[in-house]
């Protein structure tokens, strides 16, 4: 075979493809005339040496052409490989060299064969060349040889004749065959040279002809139509699949499929379900049918359809069949590397060649010229094999081939002729490799061939083996027809060619299944074919792991011994599974079906892996943690070991391919059984023991719940069975029949036997009858017991129905449906809370913005801000300063009073007021926010409480289950169910008076309520109605109560809303409940004695419930008759005990409810008190509003009397001087009185103390300040209350001087006051503010005189407003009667001492003494003074008569921060939140003193220490005597008398202090800093000692005289601007830094 194919066979084999594909007849015609040329070929071949020298160059060209042509050759290679060249794939190269041997003689072929495939290497240099490629391209391939010789012809003309002869069929010398040769050349134009250009298109077409290559490397999609897709959809999906698929892959990876599926826009959960359905192979990748299913499901999901849980059977079958088709047609990944890249695509051409060779053998025999082409075809196939080995040994064969070519040169001429004529030698080489070797040794035969043509005959004779080789080549016989040697060669050719060709075809057929066999796709566990490269090292591992017969320990494998570069798939191959099963069976000697851990350790440790790896492998193999491995799990473990030994890592989780089918099926079965059990486990209500019955019915009801096999029931038995008739008759018939049936006269022994049997049967029947009678007796007894039990139950039910509290027992708690409804409503309301809170916050923001806008509108100023949002810029300030300077100069020129200081401070005033108002608004908004947050928290906590009460507990669930069982007959026997229904019917048919009588006491009469409580529970009954009748209303009322409490704590009232909804306040519940409720709540101790005979359970006492105060004895007699109504005493059954337990539980509930009612009552009382306090505040607010209106009217009247007011100023100045002189002596006496009073003061608070809490109980200030005057007095006693600028919580209530000092003060200044003058003076002082009523700007007025006059009057009021009025402040100071000014006194209505008007005048007169407005900026507006109507201030009543203190404080709060005379918005806001400004702040006091009511008779200014505005922080703690008799911080409660109390107070800050005429000492404390306050510090009645007082500026001598002169003249006074009046509202006003 080798020799034949290698040398001479090249051309014949090459001719075979030609004959197959292109026709043999023309070639035969060419060959016959060319036979002579073959003889001449040796001469041409004599130059092969040169030809060889030339061939390398031609070979390089041919190589270049071969490389692209190799693809075409691949299709032709397999036949050669299968014919025997598979073992020697390079034979093709040798065959190429066959051309050389062909030329040189058989011996040359022997030489080439000797090289052993060195000729393979050599021939590529010569014929390894393109002949392969050219022949492949032509599949005539012939001209490859022709063309190469043609290339060689230029070098050797004789050699040219050889090629043409070699072309054999296209020789150039023969003119007649030249045309066919040209045709062959054109066919062979596929080869390298110019003539091959027209043939290149076949080259490209042939690679495509190798269509199998596109199937392997491309995408293989069967032409199968999927029924669930339309044709367009399937085509579109196929195109999309091909585009997304990487080259060389058949399945779309998970990542790429995910990217495509994500384009659908479906959620990941839906895509996950679609992936689980589409990935039928569980490989993590999608073949085309799976991809089509995924796209189909995505389309359905996009349309809105739901993704099914499972695919339909139709889709499953179509997809699985298509997946199988793809799997069978895709070559196994392991088999690809086994063959060269050219081997696979040659499959189809090989088949074609084989088929053609098989079908045309006869034709080949007829036409040897075609056989000549066959020789070319065989040359074809070797050349193809050369191309296979070509990349590896292309150049080397050329180099080594030079040697044989030289040998051919030695005797080339005749051997070439003999070779050309005698193809038989070439055939003889094909017969086997051994002859080739012998040829190699024999160089002498080569010489004999060279001697002459005789050797040709010898070749023929020696060609007997060659004839055997050439038996397969029938065409050679045709060629040899003209030549006897050729005929012999051809005859010998036939059989060998046939034998050679047959294995080729069959061998190639065997390779096809190898390519298609890898049907095992991922997931097919244990059914994967063995990879083509085998399982390296598996036998070694098997030998190592098998148990040793000797029992000696086996040496462990080295860890890396089995590691190779082998490909080991995840799935277990069949052969591998068999090996693992063998190892398993060898170790499982007990045939237990499993290997325990110890045995597994012995096996696995022999693999050489470390312990950690083996642990991981065991964990993966034993997922259920059984501690042993069955056969499949053992195979998994071994496969993992094998993979790891081959270099693969151990996975973290078992891939789907390795999950054993047994475990899958078992887990599925277990899950299915569990689902069955779960589905049937929840069914209750029917008893499965149907033999139990109270009726005695012996018939057993058949149903599907219970099945019991009856062994005696055999079903149908055929009568035709032998032996069965007699036994059946004997058992069913009579004895006579038995005898007759026994047949033919039974013997006596048989009759005796029958008698004994019948006797036994009779005895059994008797025993059965006795048992039945015994059973009937037992059943009858049970029936009687059941009947008795029924009667007892009926009696108990009757007693329950008759009992007044039957509603409680029948309706214990709300039903589950009602609870669920309440829970839903509660959740719904809770969900609305955030939205409501958000709306309230938004409204709060709007309110704050509106307040700021209102402030800007009501407080116009010359200092207009030009910045964003009306902000004042530096340019605005500069302009205001320049304007103020200009006014000062004008005043100096005109001789008017200077207003430079006030104008200069105008911008600071406005900014301070704006800042104050802004902070106030922000604080108010923050407070509201906090209140809203508190409400939210309270509602949430209330919701949690209610939900916890409504939520069912485990006990309630169990109780409800028992209740439903015994009341609704759920889950009981049929008889019991009927009995329960009968009880229910009797209960409903019984008249209702009993229930009415039971419900009546629950709601009303005390005569029945008490007996019921004593009889049933021994406790009070008020909870009965709430527990059983209307629990829903109770829960609602409780929720309302809690909400009202929390809102009341925040100062919000919701009582009207609650009443509007029909819910009575919690405190009204005890009154509305039965009259017996209150006595029972008051004293369960009295009610319990009557209950003790029936139920001896002191549950209420033991649970720690406090015994109520008293019980109504009238109800006790009524309780005794009801005792017998309770459970009968003679019943000692468990029912009584259960009943007692229920009643005890009821008593506990009632006790808890009583406690709750008591707490609710207390809270309601507190709420009422708070409500009263709030109403009082509202009343005061209304009064203040009326007072403001009165003042406004008085001011309007006073405008018409401005001239008279100017004249009155002189009188006021005189009055001020008189008051000033009186004041000089008054302080000297007042301190002595104060000093004398401390001992009395210490005793007087004790009797007044009891009345203080009652008076202050409704005061929200006391509640916010931890309630009561004690808390208010504590800071004062500690010396910390003297700072009015601290937080309101620390010093809110301000202590007032003792009544003794107040009584003395009016006596010292009994000077009468003209009310008209005072009114006019006040009107002038308030001119600036009252002008605001017309929404004008006082600064815009041109009347400078009025401006100065108002300003001077305001300045005087600020300087001297606190000279005498501090005495009048005591009644509302809220402090007890004590000499200590820091103590708190009970509130009293404001008194009107006669000194107050004079003091006011003095203050006005003293205001003229201020050197200038710069040292004393204007005070806050006067109309904002908290002044009650004149009717409320006739005199100061006793401390015990004092009404609540707060009314005075809120009034000041409302009015002080309102620019207009009446500001209802601020009044209301401050009334709601009036707990932030301390009562004794100097701001309030100065306001209160500076503006007494105008419309009232001449009462003095209010004496109450008014609270500061809500949002305005108090001034700094530097003025201890600002109208409130507080000592400065750090002074003990009874401070020593100030030595200089006889003198009027000096002006504050830089303003010079005034010495009283007569050298009176200076007043105690100075006022706030001048930039903030223009008013001097008011004198404190109990001022500190001189050492404790802050320093004062030096007094200016003569200041009083100058000031009084100005006041008398009235020319330098000017109207005070509204900004100046409110200067004290600034949070930094009056701050004194210690």
UniProtKB/Swiss-Prot annotation:
What GO terms fall under cellular component here? actin cortical patch; cytoplasm; endosome membrane; plasma membrane
The record's section on CDD domains has:
EH
Q: Give the subcellular location.
A: Cell membrane; Endosome membrane; Cytoplasm, Cytoskeleton, Actin patch
Task: Write down the SUPFAM superfamilies for this protein, in alphabetical order.
Answer: EF-hand
| Pfam families (alphabetical) | DUF1720, EH
Q: Where is the composition biased (Basic and acidic residues)?
A: 1029-1045, 1140-1203, 1614-1623
List GO BP terms, alphabetically. endocytosis; endosomal transport
One molecular function GO term is: calcium ion binding
Name all EF-hand domain ranges: 266-301, 609-644
For the region Disordered, give the residue spans: 1-215, 330-471, 492-522, 711-744, 946-965, 985-1634
**According to the UniProt entry, which residue ranges have a biased composition of type Gly residues?**
1-11
Q: Kindly report the protein's main subcellular placement as a broad class.
A: membrane
Q: Identify this protein by name.
A: Actin cytoskeleton-regulatory complex protein PAN1
Identify the species of origin: Yarrowia lipolytica (strain CLIB 122 / E 150) (Yeast)
Lineage from the top down? Answer: Eukaryota, Fungi, Dikarya, Ascomycota, Saccharomycotina
The primary gene name is: PAN1
């Amino acid at each position: 075979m080798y020799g034949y194919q290698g040398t001479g066979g090249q051309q014949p084999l090459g001719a075979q493809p030609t004959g197959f594909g292109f026709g043999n007849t023309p070639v035969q015609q060419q060959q016959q005339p060319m036979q002579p040329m073959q003889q001449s070929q040796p001469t041409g071949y004599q130059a092969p040496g040169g030809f060889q020298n030339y061939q390398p160059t031609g070979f390089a060209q041919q190589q270049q052409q071969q490389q692209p042509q190799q693809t075409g050759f691949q299709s032709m290679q397999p036949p050669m490989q299968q014919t025997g060249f598979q073992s020697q794939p390079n034979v093709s190269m040798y065959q190429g060299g066959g051309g050389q041997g062909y030329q040189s003689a058989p011996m040359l072929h022997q030489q080439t064969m000797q090289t052993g495939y060195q000729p393979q290497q050599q021939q590529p240099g010569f014929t390894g060349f393109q002949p392969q490629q050219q022949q492949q391209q032509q599949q005539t391939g012939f001209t490859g040889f022709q063309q190469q010789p043609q290339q060689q012809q230029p070098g050797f003309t004789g050699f040219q004749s050889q090629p043409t002869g070699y072309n054999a069929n296209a020789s150039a010398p023969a003119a007649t065959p030249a045309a066919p040769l040209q045709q062959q050349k054109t066919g062979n134009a596929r080869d390298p040279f110019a003539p091959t250009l027209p043939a290149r298109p076949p080259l490209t077409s042939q690679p495509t002809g190798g269509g199998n290559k596109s199937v392997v490397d491309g995408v293989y999609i069967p032409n199968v139509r999927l029924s669930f897709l339309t044709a367009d959809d399937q085509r579109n999906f196929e195109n999309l699949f091909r585009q997304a698929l990487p080259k060389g892959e058949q399945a779309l990876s998970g990542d790429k499929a995910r990217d495509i599926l994500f384009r659908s826009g479906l959620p990941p959960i839906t895509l996950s379900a679609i992936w689980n359905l589409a990935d039928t192979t569980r490989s993590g990748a999608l073949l085309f049918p799976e991809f089509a299913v995924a796209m189909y499901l995505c389309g359905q999901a996009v349309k809105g359809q739901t993704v099914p849980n499972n695919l339909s059977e139709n889709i499953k079958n179509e997809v699985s069949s298509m997946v199988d088709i793809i799997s069978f047609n895709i070559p196994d990944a392991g088999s690809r590397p086994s063959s060269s890249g050219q081997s696979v695509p040659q499959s189809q051409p090989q088949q074609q060649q084989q088929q053609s060779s098989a079908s045309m053998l006869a034709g080949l025999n007829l036409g040897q010229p075609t056989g000549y082409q066959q020789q070319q075809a065989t040359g074809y196939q070797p050349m193809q094999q050369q191309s296979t080995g070509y990349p590896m040994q292309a150049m080397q064969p050329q180099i080594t081939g030079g040697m044989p070519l030289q040998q051919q040169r030695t005797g080339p001429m005749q051997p070439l002729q003999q070779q050309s004529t005698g193809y038989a030698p070439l055939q003889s080489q094909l017969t086997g490799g051994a002859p080739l070797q012998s040829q190699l040794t024999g160089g002498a035969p080569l010489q004999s061939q060279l001697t002459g043509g005789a050797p040709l005959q010898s070749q023929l004779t020696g060609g007997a083996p060659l004839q055997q080789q050439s038996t397969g080549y029938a065409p050679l016989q045709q060629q040899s027809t003209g030549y006897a040697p050729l005929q012999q060669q051809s005859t010998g050719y036939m059989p060998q060619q046939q034998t050679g060709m047959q294995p080729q075809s069959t061998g190639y057929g065997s390779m096809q299944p190898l390519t298609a066999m890898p049907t095992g796709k991922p997931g097919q566990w244990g059914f994967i074919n063995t990879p083509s490269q085998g399982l390296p090292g598996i036998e070694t591992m098997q030998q190592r792991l098998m148990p040793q017969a000797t029992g000696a320990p086996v040496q462990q494998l080295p860890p890396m011994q089995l590691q190779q570069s082998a490909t080991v798939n995840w799935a277990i191959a069949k052969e591998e599974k068999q090996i693992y099963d063998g190892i398993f069976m060898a170790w499982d000697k007990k045939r237990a079906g499993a290997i325990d851990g110890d045995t597994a350790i012995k096996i696995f440790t022999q693999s050489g892996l470390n312990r950690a790896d083996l642990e991981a492998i065991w964990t993966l193999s034993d997922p259920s943690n059984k501690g042993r491995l069955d056969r499949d799990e053992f195979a998994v473990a071994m496969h993992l070991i094998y993979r790891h030994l081959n270099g693969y890592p151990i996975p973290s989780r078992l891939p789907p391919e390795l999950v054993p089918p047994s475990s899958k099926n078992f887990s599925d079965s277990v899950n299915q059984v569990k689902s069955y059990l779960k589905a049937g486990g929840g069914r209750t209500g029917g008893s499965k023991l149907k033999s139990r019955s109270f009726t005695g019915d012996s018939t057993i009801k058949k149903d599907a719940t219970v099945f019991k096999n009856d062994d005696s029931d055999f079903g149908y038995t055929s009568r035709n069975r032998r032996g069965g008739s007699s036994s059946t008759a004997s058992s069913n018939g009579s004895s006579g029949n038995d005898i007759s049936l026994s047949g033919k006269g039974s013997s006596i022994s048989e009759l005796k036997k029958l008698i004994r049997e019948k006797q036994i049967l009779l005895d059994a029947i008797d025993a059965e009858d006795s048992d039945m009678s015994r059973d009937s007796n037992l059943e009858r007894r049970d029936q009687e017991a059941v009947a008795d039990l029924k009667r007892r139950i009926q009696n108990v039910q009757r007693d329950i129905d008759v009992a007044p509290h039957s509603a409680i027992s029948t309706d214990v708690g709300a039903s589950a449906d009602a609870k669920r409804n309440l829970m839903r409503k509660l959740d719904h309301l809770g969900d609305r809370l955030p939205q409501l809170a958000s709306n309230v916050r938004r409204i709060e923001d709007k309110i704050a913005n509106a307040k700021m806008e209102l402030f800007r509108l009501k407080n116009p100023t010359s200092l207009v801000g030009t910045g964003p949002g009306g902000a004042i810029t530096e340019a605005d300030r500069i302009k205001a300063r320049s304007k103020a300077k200009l006014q000062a100069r004008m005043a100096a020129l005109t001789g008017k009073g200077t207003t430079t200081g006030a104008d200069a401070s105008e911008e600071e005033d406005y900014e301070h007021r704006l800042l104050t108002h802004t902070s106030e608004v922000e604080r108010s908004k923050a407070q509201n926010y906090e209140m809203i947050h508190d409400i939210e928290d309270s509602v949430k906590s209330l919701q949690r409480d209610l939900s916890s009460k409504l939520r069912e507990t485990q006990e309630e669930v169990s109780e409800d289950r028992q209740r439903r069982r015994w009341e609704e007959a759920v889950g009981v026997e049929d008889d019991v169910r009927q009995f329960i229904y009968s009880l229910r019917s009797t209960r409903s048919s019984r008249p209702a008076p009993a229930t009415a009588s039971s419900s009546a006491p629950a709601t009303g009469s005390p005569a029945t309520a008490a007996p019921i409580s004593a009889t049933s529970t021994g406790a009070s009954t008020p909870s009965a109605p709430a527990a059983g009748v209307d629990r829903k209303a109770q829960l609602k009322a409780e929720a309302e109560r809690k909400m009202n409490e929390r809102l009341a704590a925040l100062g919000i009232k919701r009582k009207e809303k609650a009443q509007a909804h029909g819910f009575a306040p919690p405190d009204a519940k005890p009154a509305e409940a039965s009259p017996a409720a209150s006595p029972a709540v008051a004293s369960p101790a009295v009610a319990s004695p009557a209950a003790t005979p029936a139920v001896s359970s002191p549950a209420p006492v033991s649970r720690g419930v406090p015994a109520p105060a008293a019980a109504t004895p009238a109800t006790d007699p009524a309780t005794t008759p009801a005792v017998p109504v309770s459970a009968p005493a003679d019943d000692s059954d468990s029912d009584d005990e259960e009943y007692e337990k229920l009643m005890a539980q009821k008593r506990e509930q009632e006790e808890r409810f009583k406690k709750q009612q008591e707490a609710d009552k207390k809270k309601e009382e507190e709420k009422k008190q708070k409500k009263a306090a709030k109403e009082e505040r509202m009343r005061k607010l209304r009064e203040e509003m009326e007072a403001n209106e009165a003042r406004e009217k008085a001011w309007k009247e006073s405008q018409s009397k401005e001239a008279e007011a100017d004249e009155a100023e002189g009188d006021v100045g005189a009055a001020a001087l008189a008051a000033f002189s009186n004041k000089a002596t008054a302080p000297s006496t007042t301190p002595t009185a104060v000093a004398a009073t401390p001992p009395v003061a210490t005793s007087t608070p004790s009797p007044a103390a009891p009345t203080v809490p009652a008076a202050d109980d409704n005061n929200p200030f006391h509640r916010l300040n931890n309630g009561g005057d004690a808390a208010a007095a504590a800071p004062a006693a500690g010396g910390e209350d003297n700072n009015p600028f601290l937080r309101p919580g620390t010093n809110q209530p301000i202590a007032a001087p003792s009544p003794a000092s107040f009584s003395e003060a009016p006596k010292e200044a009994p000077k009468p006051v003209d009310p008209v003058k005072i009114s006019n003076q006040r009107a002038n002082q308030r001119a600036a503010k009252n002008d605001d009523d017309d929404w004008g700007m006082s600064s815009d007025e041109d009347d400078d005189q009025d401006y100065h006059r108002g300003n001077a009057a305001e300045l005087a009021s600020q300087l001297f407003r606190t000279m005498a009025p501090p005495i009048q402040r005591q009644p509302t100071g809220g402090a007890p009667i004590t000499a200590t000014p820091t103590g708190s006194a009970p509130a009293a209505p404001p008194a009107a001492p006669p000194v107050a008007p004079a003091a006011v005048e003095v203050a006005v007169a003293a205001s003229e003494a201020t050197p200038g407005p710069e040292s004393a900026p204007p005070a806050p507006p006067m109309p904002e003074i908290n002044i009650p109507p004149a009717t409320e201030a006739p005199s100061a009543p006793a401390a015990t008569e004092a009404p609540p203190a707060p009314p005075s404080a809120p009034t000041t709060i409302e009015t002080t921060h309102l620019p207009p005379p009446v500001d209802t918005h601020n009044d209301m806001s401050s009334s709601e939140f009036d707990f932030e400004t301390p009562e004794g702040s100097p701001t309030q006091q100065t306001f209160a003193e500076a503006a007494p009511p105008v419309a009232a008779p001449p009462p003095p200014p209010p004496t109450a220490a008014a609270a500061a505005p809500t949002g305005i922080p108090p001034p700094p703690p530097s003025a201890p005597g600002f109208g409130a008799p507080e000592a400065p911080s750090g002074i003990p409660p009874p401070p020593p008398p100030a030595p200089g109390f006889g003198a009027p107070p000096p002006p504050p800050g830089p303003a010079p202090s005034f010495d009283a005429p007569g050298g009176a000492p200076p007043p105690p404390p100075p006022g706030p800093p001048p930039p903030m306050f223009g008013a001097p510090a008011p004198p404190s009645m109990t001022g500190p000692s001189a050492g404790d007082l802050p320093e004062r500026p030096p007094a200016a001598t003569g200041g009083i005289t100058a000031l009084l002169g100005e006041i008398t003249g009235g020319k330098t006074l000017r109207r005070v601007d509204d900004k100046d009046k409110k200067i004290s509202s600034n949070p930094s006003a009056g701050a004194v830094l210690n």
